[in-house]
From Swiss-Prot:
Pathway: One-carbon metabolism; methanogenesis from CO(2); 5,10-methenyl-5,6,7,8-tetrahydromethanopterin from CO(2): step 1/3
Inducing or repressing factors: By growth on molybdenum, under anaerobic conditions.
Protein name: Molybdenum-containing formylmethanofuran dehydrogenase 1 subunit C
Start-end of each Sequence repeat: 76-88, 95-107, 114-126, 140-152, 159-171, 178-190, 197-209
Subunit structure: Consists of five subunits; FmdA, FmdB, FmdC, FmdD, and FmdE.
NCBIfam families xrefs: one_C_dehyd_C (TIGR03122)
Classification via PANTHER family: TUNGSTEN FORMYLMETHANOFURAN DEHYDROGENASE, SUBUNIT C (FWDC), TUNGSTEN-CONTAINING FORMYLMETHANOFURAN DEHYDROGENASE 2 SUBUNIT C
GO BP term, example: methanogenesis, from carbon dioxide
Keyword terms, alphabetized: Methanogenesis, Oxidoreductase, Repeat
Region called 7 X 13 AA repeats of [GW]-X-X-M-X-X-G-X-I-X-[IV]-X-G, residue ranges: 76-209
Organism: Methanothermobacter marburgensis (strain ATCC BAA-927 / DSM 2133 / JCM 14651 / NBRC 100331 / OCM 82 / Marburg)
GO molecular function, one term: molybdopterin cofactor binding
Length: 400
């Protein structure tokens, strides 16, 4: 026997309802189901306070929820069998740590769905938020099995730390799709944001639309046709140890990335040339700040520099200093010609100067937010100088 749940009223305080699971309902009568405990804030209350619950003659181990549960979290968390159908929008952490069964949503869902799931299927006939199939914060191992199907769009950090399983997105995806991916497969039929596959070491990502930017840690391998589209396979992320990640992108929709520009064909605007900025810690930087002091001349010498490809360095007139600008902020840095840098990209050691340029993007933590950022690069004028760490803190309020 199945059950139908209908919210009695709007939820004023978010509800944590991990007891809404077909395998937990099995064998219980209506009174026992109504008595199952949920959390309203930090207070335990019976499920029956919030939902009208009735039996239905439909298939066994079926729960149908009719109504808006966008402020209800953990529905289907850890479920092992059965089916949940939700006719309405759903809140955070739907189906997290799910091991089996099926969840279908006729509406939109919030973030963290299928987090660290092991098996089963989640189907969303609408849009989804961030962190689909990802790992908990502080963990590196995300989705380990199962399948997530999203017919609409999805947000940032899809499949973060994914180990196995499948994620299908019928629409667009946000930034850092497949970040730190270790296995499994992600398919995006629409467009994706910047830096797909950041720090991936294994797994497959297929993006059939346009991507905002491609990290320099991906190497082009081959071209082939799939479903009538010309696709290109890249291997990466080469910034990781022994990477075996496969990133497929649509050739015709990504000519802005795939067509190698020449220095003669690039245009210097008033802002400068548009490049992709990447950052990371260096060994020397670590040695300098080991004692916690970032206010030394050595620190400025190491971190207030911009590594530029020979082509771009020549295009800018072989400058001594450059100005890098992003989202309204700009810094002056010492220009360093580096043959290890790809044309159209720059590298700045992670420090206060890099922090000024990094967008205030908080959906990701750690190094990936310092990767694949579009910035402008120009030759510094005679009156523009490199600011000290103290001056940057005072001007921009960035932390040390």
């Amino acid at each position: 026997m199945g059950f139908v749940l209908v919210p009695k009223s709007d939820f004023q305080i978010p509800l944590e309802a991990d007891t809404i699971r077909p395998d937990l309902f099995e064998g219980l009568d209506l009174d026992e189901i109504r008595s199952l405990q949920v959390y309203e804030g930090n207070i335990k209350r019976p499920l029956g306070e919030f939902f009208e619950i009735a039996e239905t003659s439909h298939e066994d181990q079926l729960i149908r929820i009719d109504g808006d549960v966008s402020r209800v979290k953990y529905i289907g968390s850890g479920m092992k069998s059965g089916k949940i159908i939700i006719n309405g929008d759903v809140g955070l952490q739907l189906g997290c740590e799910m091991k089996g069964g099926e969840i279908e949503v006729n509406g939109n869902v919030s973030s963290w769905i299928g987090m660290e799931m092991h098996g089963g299927t989640i189907k969303i006939n609408g849009n989804a938020g961030d962190y689909v199939g990802c790992a908990y914060r502080g963990e590196w191992r995300g989705m380990k099995g199962g399948k997530i199907i999203i017919q609409g769009n999805a947000g940032n950090n899809i499949g973060g730390g994914m180990m196995a399983g499948e994620i299908y997105i019928g629409g667009d995806a946000g930034n850092f799709c497949g970040i730190r991916m270790n296995g499994g497969e992600i398919t995006v039929r629409g467009d994706a944001g910047r830096a797909p596959g950041a720090e991936m070491v294994s797994g497959i990502i297929k993006i059939h639309g346009r991507i905002s930017s491609l990290l320099p840690g991906f190497k082009e391998i081959s071209t082939f046709k799939e479903d009538g589209s010309l696709m290109i396979l890249f291997k990466g992320d080469l910034s990781e140890k022994n990477p075996e990640g496969n990133l497929y992108i649509n050739y015709n929709k990504n000519l802005h990335i795939l067509e190698n520009e020449t220095d003669e064909g690039r245009v210097i605007t008033k802002k400068g040339i548009k490049v992709i900025y990447n950052s990371g810690s260096t060994i020397r930087e670590g040695q300098i700040i080991k004692g916690g002091n970032k206010l030394t001349d050595d620190y400025i010498d190491e971190c207030a520099r911009c590594c530029i490809s020979p082509e771009d360095y020549k295009l800018l007139g072989e400058p001594e200093n450059v100005v890098v600008s992003s989202h309204g902020n700009e810094v002056v840095l010492r220009a360093v010609e580096d043959p290890g840098i790809q044309m159209g990209t720059i590298f700045i050691p992670r420090g206060i100067w890099a922090n000024v340029l990094t967008p205030p993007y908080t959906e990701s933590t750690g190094s990936p937010m310092y990767k694949g950022v579009p910035v402008y690069l120009r030759k510094a004028s005679q009156g523009e100088r490199i600011l000290s760490a103290e001056e940057l803190v005072e001007e921009y309020g960035v932390g040390k």
